[in-house]
Amino acid sequence: MQTKAKNKNMNIKSITIDGFCNIENSIIELNKISSIIALNNYGKSNLIKAIDFAQTFLNQVPKKRNSMMRYKPLIPINKKIASRNFIFGIEFETNFNSLKTLVYYSFSFEWVKDDGKKGARIVGESLKYMPLKKDARYKTIIKRTITKSLYQSSKTGRCDNEIKIGKNELLVNKLLNFDNLFYFNLLDEINNINFAVVDSLSNPDRLFRTISD
């Protein structure tokens, strides 16, 4: 799997997946070369599918997202994780305000319930950043729960500006309409992340072609 973005300075550090098929709270830490090793039927392919699913979800229109949250073959059926929401998180390093900065973005949604009426809604979203310097801490600029969606509108403000958003919409998409936000470049980077999933065993030429692009 190869990761790409518009900003060549972006360096993806880790990916978090939860609530997808048999995947529970899994964190992949990425280096230049990373391997996923496990016994057969332990979910290696599901982990890759989950990352591809998250990328598709991130870039889809609300109507398509509604269908994705209702796709039963991907909903966890193991009793231990059957009620877990889908969670995707990505941590990356980039240049922001002329400083090397660590950024963490995540979203979560509730899978459709058995009755087909409840669930199928985005229930959480967060974006925070931390300059890579001494004593720095993460600062939240997007925060969303089931009941409220907040964002920070200025460098000196707080993450307390409420915005209306649909249950199938993502703040990181909607806020691209506010091109005066001081963190607009971070939003743009997240919206342009691309995971190239390549089966190099069946088609190795695709892998080399992807890397050379």
Enumerate the predicted regions with their spans.
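Conserved lysine of the Walker
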Residues: 44
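Phosphate-binding P-loop
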Residues: 25-31
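Conserved P-loop NTP-binding catalytic core
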Residues: 48-115
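N-terminal pre-Walker A segment at the start of P-loop NTPase domains
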Residues: 2-24
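Hydrophobic anchor at the beta1->P-loop junction of P-loop NTPases
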Residues: 36
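Electropositive, glycine-dotted interaction segments
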Residues: 100-213
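A generic structural motif
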Residues: 18, 91-95, 128-132
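The conserved Walker
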Residues: 40
